[in-house]
C-alpha cells in the first residue's frame, strides 16, 4: 500500500504538479471580484502579497475565466526575463514579430493594442507577475507605453503583481504619475484559521478522500506554523502524509505534524 492509498486519496492534492484544486476562500473571491472590475474599467491594477499566498493562482484563474472573444491575455514573469526579453515577449504575446530595438517594439505593441481595442473590440489584459523585480526603467517605460494621447480612455488592462516591496518601489516620487493611474490596488493577507481548515478539507475532498486524515491538533499546528500561507500548508500536509505512511498511521496526529513542520523549517 502506498501513502496515497493509505489515506484514501486518488492523488496527492498537496503537490504543486498534482491536479488543480482551486479553493476559493473569501480573499480569493475578493481578488477575483476586483480583477473582474479592472477588466471592465481598464487601466493599471496592483496585486501584492507575501510569497505563497496564491497571487499567481488567482491571476491564472482570472485569465482562464475571460471570454477570448472579448479579452486577450499576455502573461509575463519578470523573474525569468531580461528587459529586452520582456518587450520581445510582450510583442510575441500580441502575435507580432519582435524587433531587436526597444523603440520598434514600443511601436509594435502600441499598434497591436490599437488594432485589438479599436478595430476588434478586444481588450488586452497584460499581466506582469513577479513585478517586485521590476526596474525603474521599465516602470517609466510602462507609463509611456500605455499612454495613448489620442483620447482619455484606457485601451488595455495592465496588472502588476508581486511581493509587498513592489509598493515601496511605486511609492518613490519618480513613479507618482504611474501610481496615480492605478485604479485597483489589493494586498493579499493569507488564509484565516477558518479558511485554512476549509482549504485542507476541500483539498482532500477534491482528491476523492472520504475518511478522516488529519486530527484537529495536527490541523491547528499546521495552520499556526503556516501563518495562513497556502504554499506552506501544502508543504506541511504533504510531509505529514509521507511521515504518517512511514510510521504506519491511520490519521495524522499533532506529533507527526510537528515533525513535518520541523523537517521543512530545518530543510
Regions found by a protein language model. Give the residues of each.
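Walker A/P-loop nucleotide-binding motif
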Residues: 40-61
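Conserved AAA+ ATPase "SRH/arginine-finger" region at the nucleotide-binding site
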Residues: 76-79, 170, 183-196
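Conserved Walker B catalytic segment
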Residues: 44, 114, 120-160, 173
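A short, basic N-terminal segment
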Residues: 1-42, 258, 262, 267
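Conserved alpha-helical scaffold flanking the Walker A/P-loop in AAA+ ATPase domains
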Residues: 34-37, 103-119
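Short regulatory helix/loop adjacent to the ATP-binding pocket of P-loop NTPases
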Residues: 63-66, 166-181
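C-terminal alpha-helical "lid" subdomain
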Residues: 2-4, 60, 177, 194-201, ...
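Conserved NTP-binding/hydrolysis module of P-loop NTPases
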Residues: 9-14, 71-73, 81-100
Amino acid at each position: 500500500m502506498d501513502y496515497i492509498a493509505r489515506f484514501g486519496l486518488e492523488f496527492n492534492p498537496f503537490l504543486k504538479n498534482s491536479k488543480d484544486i482551486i479553493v476559493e476562500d473569501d480573499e480569493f473571491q475578493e481578488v477575483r471580484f476586483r480583477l473582474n472590475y479592472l477588466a471592465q474599467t481598464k487601466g493599471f491594477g496592483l496585486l501584492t502579497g507575501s510569497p505563497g499566498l496564491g497571487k499567481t493562482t488567482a491571476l491564472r484563474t482570472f485569465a482562464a475565466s475571460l471570454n477570448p472573444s472579448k479579452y486577450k491575455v499576455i502573461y509575463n514573469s519578470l523573474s525569468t526575463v531580461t528587459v529586452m526579453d520582456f518587450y520581445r515577449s510582450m510583442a510575441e504575446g500580441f502575435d507580432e514579430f519582435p524587433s531587436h530595438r526597444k523603440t520598434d517594439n514600443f511601436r509594435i505593441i502600441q499598434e497591436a493594442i490599437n488594432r485589438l481595442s479599436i478595430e476588434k473590440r478586444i481588450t488586452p489584459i497584460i499581466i506582469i507577475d513577479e513585478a517586485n523585480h521590476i526596474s525603474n526603467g521599465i516602470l517609466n517605460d510602462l507609463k509611456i507605453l500605455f499612454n495613448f494621447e489620442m483620447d482619455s480612455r484606457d485601451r488595455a488592462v495592465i496588472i502588476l503583481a508581486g511581493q509587498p516591496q513592489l509598493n515601496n518601489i511605486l511609492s518613490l516620487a519618480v513613479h507618482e504619475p504611474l501610481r496615480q493611474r492605478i485604479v485597483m490596488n489589493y494586498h493579499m493577507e493569507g488564509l484565516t484559521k477558518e479558511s485554512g481548515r476549509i482549504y485542507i478539507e476541500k483539498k482532500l475532498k477534491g482528491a476523492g478522500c472520504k475518511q478522516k486524515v488529519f486530527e484537529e491538533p495536527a490541523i491547528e499546528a499546521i495552520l499556526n506554523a503556516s501563518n495562513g500561507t497556502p504554499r506552506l500548508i501544502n508543504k506541511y500536509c504533504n510531509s505529514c502524509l509521507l511521515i504518517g505512511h512511514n510510521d504506519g498511521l491511520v490519521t495524522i496526529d499533532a506529533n507527526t505534524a510537528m515533525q513535518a513542520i520541523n523537517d521543512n523549517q530545518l530543510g
